[in-house]
């Protein structure tokens, strides 16, 4: 029996698809029902003693559970920083307490971006992102120190399914990519060669399933694209090529190095001259893309035992196009395509993307 938290989320849905083939699944959920016949739901609160359950319920749950996959997390960076920390750190402590009672290993879903600590200036400007990364770093430490077996899982940004492109919820990065397709992003923070490390949800779920089936109960695993991650200019050009299926190729956004964003652009647009909607949008993009600005690629455990095959640039580009196709058919509000969309087989046309020098 696998206890899963976060089953109603993007990754949680993919984990149910993957794990329900071989495991009975009990989903702890708070407000949002999972509504999936393949699982049994238990309403609980990770921030309450004994998960908010009666003593007998808690003890029966502990006696039943054999494996714990803790995927629930506060991921909205617009939330109060204190609430982000409580959800991500205290919720992890609660799962470790249950694991100790159950004698079960914990598979803790962290994030690859713990490897990108923010500078003091960035922490002050983006308190939500800072709280999220700090809480994930602290949660990893309590997993390491816990008296139960623990596996730390570090996915990068989780995108939709690699085959269908579908995703359970609209992610911030999906909105940004959709805005590029619509030609609504004149300026984009980040260096052209920054790696936008994204991994399809089914790839992450397959790796987690492989670790559970393989009996792996310790270690740290990077569920990332690693050195194969698409560069920011490649992501932009793929979006522009996709948009050509619906009409004229949008004007490419200017890519502004992050140091110029902090030193020049953010102070400028935070003045009274610019509309509030423009300030909010650019601030969101700057915060979202902040974590991708690193010199070296992430490590990747994909391709190692139990974790499934490694990803290639071509596979990632194809997955991105399928994600854009699913987005356009759903919430994207795009017209019917004028031709069938095909992933670009070669390198994206980076010459179309212009860099504004610092």
Predicted regions and their residues:
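N-terminal Rossmann NAD(P)H-binding glycine-rich loop of SDR-like oxidoreductase domains
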Residues: 1-22
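Conserved Rossmann-fold NAD(P)-dependent oxidoreductase catalytic core, especially the SDR/UDP-sugar
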Residues: 67-71, 78, 82-86, 90-134, ...
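Short-chain dehydrogenase/reductase
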Residues: 85-89, 128-140, 167-170, 174, ...
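Conserved Rossmann-fold cofactor-binding substructure of NAD(P)-dependent oxidoreductases
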Residues: 39-65
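Mid/C-terminal beta-alpha module of Rossmann-like enzyme folds, strongest
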Residues: 207-283, 322-330, 334-358
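Conserved glycine-rich Rossmann-like NAD(P)H-binding loop of the short-chain dehydrogenase/reductase
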Residues: 23-34, 110
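A hydrophobic C-terminal alpha-helical subdomain
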Residues: 187-188, 258-311
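NAD(P)-dependent short-chain dehydrogenase/reductase
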Residues: 147-152, 156-196, 201
């Amino acid at each position: 029996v696998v206890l899963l938290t976060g089953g109603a989320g993007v990754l949680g849905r993919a984990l149910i698809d993957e794990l329900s083939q071989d495991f009975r699944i009990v989903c702890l959920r708070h407000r949002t029902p999972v509504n999936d016949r393949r699982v049994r739901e238990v309403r609980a609160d990770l921030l309450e003693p004994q998960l908010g359950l009666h003593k007998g319920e808690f003890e029966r749950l502990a006696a039943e559970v054999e494996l714990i996959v803790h995927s629930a997390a506060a991921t909205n960076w617009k939330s109060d920083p204190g609430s982000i920390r409580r959800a991500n750190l205290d919720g992890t402590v609660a799962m470790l307490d249950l694991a100790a009672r159950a004698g079960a290993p914990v598979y803790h879903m962290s994030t690859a971006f713990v490897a990108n600590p923010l500078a003091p200036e960035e922490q002050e400007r983006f308190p939500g992102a800072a709280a999220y990364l700090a809480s994930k770093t602290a949660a990893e430490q309590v997993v390491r120190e816990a008296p139960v077996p623990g596996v730390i899982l570090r996915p990068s940004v989780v995108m939709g399914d690699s085959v269908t492109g579908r995703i359970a919820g609209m992610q911030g990065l999906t909105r940004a990519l959709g805005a590029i397709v619509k030609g609504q992003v004149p300026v984009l923070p980040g260096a052209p060669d920054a790696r936008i490390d994204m991994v399809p949800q089914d790839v992450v779920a397959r790796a987690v399933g492989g670790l559970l089936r393989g009996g792996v109960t310790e270690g740290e695993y990077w569920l990332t694209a690693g050195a194969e991650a698409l560069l920011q200019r490649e992501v932009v050009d793929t979006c522009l090529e996709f948009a050509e299926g619906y009409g004229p190729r949008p004007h490419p956004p200017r890519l502004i190095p992050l140091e110029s964003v902090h030193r020049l652009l953010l102070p400028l647009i935070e003045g009274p001259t610019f509309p509030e909607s423009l300030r909010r949008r650019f601030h969101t993009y700057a915060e979202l893309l902040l974590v991708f600005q690193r010199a070296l690629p992430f490590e990747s455990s994909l391709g190692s035992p139990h974790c499934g095959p490694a990803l290639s640039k071509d596979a990632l580009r194809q997955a991105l196009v399928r994600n854009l196709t699913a987005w356009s058919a759903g919430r994207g509000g795009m017209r019917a395509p004028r031709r069938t969309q095909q992933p670009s087989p070669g390198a994206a046309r980076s010459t179309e993307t212009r860099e504004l020098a610092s």
